[in-house]
């Protein structure tokens, strides 16, 4: 059971076309989506998460067609977090994370739900902040609260669009370690858009590189972490050197 | 040691009420509003009744005032609940059904009726059939208008608002055009219908209006948990498995039913719902629609009865109630808009 994309295409206009993309994202483990700005990473991710209509092609998650299956059923196996989030409702961190249980509880939180909520909050080190309102948090703290909501949803497949946005070094590393743990210990499949190629190489099992709306490379970090490959993908001179913890891309 | 673990577990809960203080505040405000509502109701019923207390004429006057109060209650429920649900669906706490062209829709329907049928036909148009027909026309047209506006065709809220206002303007000129071709007596009949008036509301519609409102409010009440999620915006709601487009159509149809009912009773009101909803968000401070709806309704009812009491019993200008409430509501709207500085 995995995520499969078959001839998936999105035409924003005559000039901007994303796809066609045909690929399979393995289940279990972390897959990083990388590529320059405007490559189509968010487009592909939100289409997998059925937040954006597909023009042509099909996407299945765990064998279910994301467009034709009931949204209710998909919400129990797949969760997705977008790049930008904004709410008119005034919510505390805990209330927000509590909404992650909606697919299971339909709004009536049980003691079991509260347990998942507490776990997700603790998992992202938000325990002390759980009763704060979102508008009283820093950008990075808020970003972690959004991720906690998605984790509380407790789905096999988790799609995250740049969750490291706004995070400092410590929290970025912590979040990647936690996502790694969720994949290793809980068997989750995590698809994550990352901008830092070194993070992608170190924490993911597979890297899916996109450019100009197409998938240009899909392989293990070792296969992607090559001078020519990275230089080609990112349109900028990249040198890969041996670091203390594996290959390191130097691009500055 | 187990005891501490237990108490922290108990404190960690996620409901719409954050803590004891919040709970106390909510209950206190609801109690004050409830007391005000009861007091004003009693005041309106008994104040300055010229007949001898307890006599037959006295009861007759009380009965007439009771009808006005029931109308006020129905109108308050309609506008308060409809506005909260509408603002949740459009994910914006400034826009209201009235601002998005509902009043113009009503005017155009009424004008068309008089225009096509003339005085005789239009005055004959009273009773259940025409009432339901007029409701149906409003509900269908408004649902189409709102779902079209919300279909995601308009990339941002400003364009959506602009389109809503322009449609209102176009419908307005259409009505104006037809009104110019009416005879003076036809025009009289029409004006009487267009201006909201609680003192001589169409109380004969109440037996149909009340069941409609009760059913619609019950339907929204059962959807409250879904509404809470929809308030988080399209993508979050979709992620959580809400069939967003279908829910929007349902909510818009229910909202249209409520506003159409209130409009059929007392004419268009643009800002009553805004006033009630804004106060409920401010004082309720919660995402839960099951807590917001009752508070908004009580605010709406209290504001309307208070204006009715003052205008009718003190200034002797009962006909101006809706006008005054709209004036206050419009001012509050401007203040909120200026303070927020954005839509
Ligand atoms: N709603 C839209 N309408 C028109 N074009 C769009 C829309 N959304 C995205 N695009 C275009 O599609 C292309 C891909 O956008 P996408 O958001 O998927 O890029 P991305 O890889 O996520 O980039 P980034 O790293 O900047 O987040 C871009 O050229 C963008 O301008
Ligand atoms: Mg993006």
Task: Give residue spans per PLM region.
Chain A
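Helix-to-loop junction immediately C-terminal to a conserved catalytic motif
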Residues: 49
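The feature captures the beta-strand-to-loop junction immediately N-terminal to the Walker
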Residues: 34-36
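Conserved ABC transporter NBD signature motif
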Residues: 57-65, 73-74
